[in-house]
A protein has these predicted regions:
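Small cysteine-rich, disulfide-bonded extracellular modules of the LU/uPAR three-finger superfamily
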Residues: 1-96, 100-136
């Protein structure tokens, strides 16, 4: 029996492309996402400040790379994702969702630093900062 499980390259590319095709919304979460969450749960776990809005990233602004030797696929933003300057406190961001708007499909990227976002901060992800790796 195999030690490693998961998608093969073709299936991984198909799954990720389904989410980013046509553009994907980057959403900041103040409550941890769960494996079985749907778009409804995303709405309740997202930053709730009145000056916050999701950022749609066109599919051309995402890069997919494959490391065949290690069986990994990596999705990375190749352009600035800019939420702008906060006018209110947004709370502590614990997860980032890359969401196919209008569906229940999303990629959960753990925000390992759990930043507390307060009034007057510029919230930006430079190219290469949002990275999701699918594989062992």
């Amino acid at each position: 029996m195999a030690i490693e499980t998961g998608f093969n390259q073709s299936a991984a590319e198909t799954a990720v492309n389904q989410i980013i095709s046509g553009g994907a919304d980057v959403r900041l979460m103040t409550t941890s996402l769960d494996y079985d969450d749907t778009a409804t749960e995303l709405d309740t776990k997202e930053v709730s400040s009145t000056d916050y809005t999701t950022v749609n990233v066109p599919d051309a602004d995402w890069d997919i790379s494959v490391d065949v030797a290690n069986g990994e696929l990596t999705l990375t933003n190749n352009a600035l994702v800019d939420f702008g300057e906060t006018q209110n406190d947004w709370g502590t961001v614990v997860d980032v969702a890359i969401h196919n708007d209008g569906t229940d499909d999303f990629i959960r990227a753990d925000e390992v630093n759990d930043p507390e976002i307060t009034t007057g901060e510029l919230v930006r992800f430079p190219a290469g900062e949002i990275t999701y790796t699918l594989g062992p």
